[in-house]
Amino acid sequence: MTKSELIERLAGLQSHLSAKTVEEAVKEMLDHMADTLADGERIEVRGFGSFSLHYRAPRTGRNPKTGDKVELEGKYVPHFKPGKELRDRVNIYTE
């Protein structure tokens, strides 16, 4: 599902809200989540999951085009850990 599909679905479920209002709300929520992570804070949505930052240590990589070794700096990357309720809902189809 893309962001525009999410907005379309939410606007359909909430007929009293315009698609523009839903779009602004979704954008604001995602911006706030990104800002929170950028500040080094963790986000927890009970039953859904949590978002945090994981540190990737510096390492030696390779340029896929030339095969040359490249030194990659350490960096933080976003990480999502699904909650139990989400894991259970997703795994309902494997039983």
Swiss-Prot record:
- Keyword NAD included in the entry's annotation: no
User: Where does the signal sequence lie?
Assistant: none
This protein's GO CC annotations: chromosome; cytosol
| GO molecular function terms attached to this record | DNA binding; structural constituent of chromatin
State the CDD domains in the record.
IHF_B
Q: What does this protein do?
A: This protein is one of the two subunits of integration host factor, a specific DNA-binding protein that functions in genetic recombination as well as in transcriptional and translational control.
Question: What is stated as this protein's family in its record?
Answer: Belongs to the bacterial histone-like protein family.
Name this polypeptide is given = Integration host factor subunit beta
Higher taxonomy: Bacteria, Pseudomonadati, Pseudomonadota, Gammaproteobacteria, Enterobacterales
Q: Which gene encodes it?
A: ihfB
